[in-house]
Curated annotation (Swiss-Prot):
TM region positions: none
PANTHER family referenced in this protein's UniProt entry, alphabetically: DIPEPTIDASE, MICROSOMAL DIPEPTIDASE
Residues given in the record as Zn(2+) 2 binding sites: 167, 238, 259
Family from the record: Belongs to the metallo-dependent hydrolases superfamily. Peptidase M19 family.
Lineage, top ranks: Eukaryota, Fungi, Dikarya, Ascomycota, Pezizomycotina
A Pfam family assignment: Peptidase_M19
Claim: Disulfide bond is one of the keywords in the record: yes
Group of enzyme by EC: hydrolase
Organism, as annotated: Arthroderma otae (strain ATCC MYA-4605 / CBS 113480) (Microsporum canis)
Protein name: Putative dipeptidase MCYG_02918
Organism domain of life: Eukaryota
Cofactors (names): Zn(2+)
Keywords in alphabetical order: Dipeptidase, Disulfide bond, Glycoprotein, Hydrolase, Metal-binding, Metalloprotease, Protease, Signal, Zinc
Length: 427
């Protein structure tokens, strides 16, 4: 009887073991099926917060292709354009706001004097005009905004907020007065330089060409003072590293980088070094990551994918914090775009990747729009506070500027000593 008893006990043990094993199967299946749905999470983020891109060159693309003519079917924005941006793709990309860049190139000769005769200011105003006319034409989908409250309103109404930025100080002739008029015309940020120096600052391209990084000029602080007074965003993309540092020492308001990435990840001078990222955090500013392949990976640009963009985003978030990173693709300003981010319709995929790499939904909301809206709101508040204090517009002019021949010698029309001695000089 004893052997039979042992056999029954063994059978019972096997049965218990089998039951235990089978009980694990549903648990394992549950683990497998609970994989996060990043697309659904990205959709939740995009539904709650406007995705605002810091830099898109569509106005320049229009200028180049149609000389600013948008009517009579010349620019079929509502159906399909050949570039990287049009209304259907913006909608597919779940875009909530766009800073439209108005861009006029620097002189082709790098030795051109700063105060060169130019039509750049005229051309800039014409691009502001075409950007605003495009928004008006498609007002069912786009809303022109010159303040962050309007940007939020546009999103609530299901429209794409449309804002304007100037891509280079040479476009206002190195003139604070001209900059002020561009602000009144609707521009809400100005990039201090493009790929040329001006009366205010040194450009990154100058340093790349082997010349010294002189940073901001003596005239530069006057510009920053006026931009702070106006409530205009100071954009430090394109400037040299020393210019970044110099501006951050004098500005009273947060700054933006409308389309730059992390220098520690890719040693391109258009990117932002870590010491500057830390200062941007103290300044409460934002660095909006660009997608230009040669900036993202200077050593192997052809290999760049969406994962490389995510790497820049996470580096900036690690050094400066999630409150200080945003997005500035540079669509229609480059042909160098990563696999997976070929046009503006691909933004949801980027947000999925950011979440997949470990960002929370709260962090993703900051990235796509909350940060730039916070910065813009603070810049606007600081401007109003400065104006309410009685601060007058800055009148300072660059000492190296050329005056027309009739103005090279000051008239005594405004008397400094004797009110009886007036010289009109225009008879």
């Amino acid at each position: 009887m004893a052997p039979e008893r042992r056999s029954r006990l063994s059978d019972a043990g096997i049965l218990v073991s089998l039951l235990a094993l089978t009980s694990l199967v549903p648990v394992q299946a549950a683990v497998t099926t609970s994989k996060p749905d990043y697309a659904k999470r990205a959709e939740r983020v995009l539904r709650s917060t406007p995705l605002i891109d810091g830099h898109n060159d569509l106005p320049f693309a229009i200028r180049r292709s149609t000389h600013d003519q948008i009517y009579d079917g010349k620019v079929p924005f509502e159906t399909a354009l050949k570039g990287q941006t049009d209304l259907p793709r913006m909608r597919k990309g779940r875009m909530g706001g766009q800073f439209w860049s108005v861009y006029v190139g620097c002189p082709s000769d790098p030795n051109t004097p700063i105060d060169f005769p130019t039509f750049a200011t005229r051309d800039t105003l014409e691009q502001i005009d075409v950007a605003r006319r495009l928004v008006d034409k498609y007002s069912k989908d786009l809303m022109y905004c010159d303040n962050p409250a309007c940007a939020k309103k546009a999103f609530r109404e299901g429209k794409i907020g449309s804002f304007i930025g100037i891509e280079g100080g040479h476009q206002v002739g190195s003139s604070i007065a001209a900059l002020r008029q561009a602000f009144y015309a609707g521009a809400r940020y100005m990039t201090l330089t493009h790929n040329c120096d001006n009366a205010w600052a040194t450009a990154a391209s100058t340093v790349r060409a082997g010349k010294p990084d002189l940073g901001m000029t003596e005239f530069g602080p006057a510009l920053i003072k006026e931009m702070n007074r106006l409530g205009m965003l100071v954009d430090l993309s394109h400037v040299s590293h020393q210019t970044m540092r110099d501006v951050l020492k004098v500005t009273k308001a947060p700054v933006i980088f409308s389309h730059s990435s992390a220098y520690a990840v890719s040693k391109h001078l258009r990117n932002v070094p870590d010491d500057v990222l830390k200062t941007v955090a103290k300044n409460n500013g934002v660095v909006m990551v660009t997608f230009v392949r040669s900036f993202v990976n200077i050593d192997n640009p052809d290999s760049v994918t969406v994962d490389d963009i995510v790497k820049h985003i996470f580096h900036i978030a690690e050094v400066a914090g999630w409150d200080h990173v945003g997005l500035g693709g540079d669509y229609d300003g480059t042909t160098e775009l990563p696999k997976g981010l070929e046009d503006v319709s691909k933004y949801p995929y980027l947000i999925e990747k950011v979440l997949e790499h470990g960002a929370t939904e709260e962090q993703a909301r900051k990235l796509i729009g909350e940060n730039i809206l916070r910065v813009w709101t603070e810049v606007e508040k600081i401007g109003k506070r400065i104006q309410n204090s009685g601060a007058l517009p800055v009148e300072e002019v660059w000492q190296g500027r050329n005056w027309t021949q009739s103005l090279t010698k000051r008239s005594t029309f405004i008397p400094t000593e004797s009110p009886t001695q007036l010289e009109f000089g225009c008879d």
